[in-house]
Amino acid sequence: MENWINVNNASEDIVLSSRIRLARNLKGIPFPNKLTVDSAKDVVEKVENAIFTIPDLKDNLKSNHLWENDNETNKMYLEKHLISRGLIKHAKGSAFLIDNDETISIMINEEDHLRLQTITSGLNFKEVFKSINELDDLLEENLEYAFHEKLGYITACPTNLGTGLRASAMVHLPALTANKDIVKILNGITQLGMTIRGLYGEGSKAYGNLYQISNQITLGRAEEQIITSLEGIVKQIIQQERLARERMKTKYKYEVEDKIFRSLGVLKSARILTAREVLNLLSNVRLGVEEGIISNIDKSILNNLLINTQSASIKKSSQKKLTDIEEKIERAKIVKEGLKGIEL
């Protein structure tokens, strides 16, 4: 699979990435929130020992213990969508493993003992599901999962019971956000057992017009059914976004183009930038790239700036403590360097 951050596929507009997570627990062991720190570390060791005996995994996965990392390192992995807020919350006894391409992540002791994750670029649930299914099968041969004949996989949260599968697509919806139709969509898909959240999932806001669309219910539905249903809804939203963009360009052609190029100019010239400013300005430029208004910027550049200008990533790359203003100055420098050589 391709790392979504570094991909530059002209056909992949609107949908930045597809992700699937599986929640799994080990038989006979209390859920992570009931474990002592020492017991949680025992679970980490148990899982790692099992993984590193699997030939197909041991040479391609690197382990990270959150209790050995500084807080900024852990937050940096969150910003790259490789781990969750829940994992950081349990940092004293949690860990994760990632592959060399950063498309596979295995979180240990989040809400459940295991959260398996695969992520790739574009709307590509078929490939993502194939990858995570193979990973799950390999682990289940070496670890005994908590499973109930009627309920399916046992999870800490009842909404994950059954398949334990959560699929999500990260989508860029500037037109639907601008015309307020995103509110209608949110209300509509909630009734279909789906949800829309911000860039970093539950509890986060949709800065930069970036949303995560995911399923809410896993019990009583097959994996393929969940994925097919979600993919169908995402495709409908894509179509609505495209129609909204066409109407916007027809009615406000020069205003749209002005906003796009003005945003690019600010990104290239600003000396101080907040994280929210960058997300919103990048959204305008991304719209220009996706609509062919700007032709000399790769989407991979925008994706990397999206990640590298987040707070923890800046602090980690600078390798020193930064004041609020220093962070904003550093962010502007990163953006300027990322867009170096690109003409207005």
Swiss-Prot record:
ATP binds at residues 17-21, 81, 115, 166-170, 197-202. Keywords: ATP-binding, Kinase, Nucleotide-binding, Transferase. Residues 14-244 form the Phosphagen kinase C-terminal domain. The keyword Nucleotide-binding applies. One of its GO terms (molecular function) is ATP binding. Its EC number is 2.7.14.1. GO terms for cellular component: extracellular space. InterPro entries: Arg_Kinase, ATP-guanido_PTrfase, ATP-guanido_PTrfase_AS, ATP-guanido_PTrfase_cat, Gln_synth/guanido_kin_cat_dom. It catalyses: L-arginyl-[protein] + ATP = N(omega)-phospho-L-arginyl-[protein] + ADP + H(+). SUPFAM superfamilies: Glutamine synthetase/guanido kinase. It is an enzyme of class 2 (transferase). Catalyzes the specific phosphorylation of arginine residues in proteins. NCBIfam families: PRK01059.1-4. This is Protein-arginine kinase. It comes from Clostridium novyi (strain NT). The gene is mcsB.
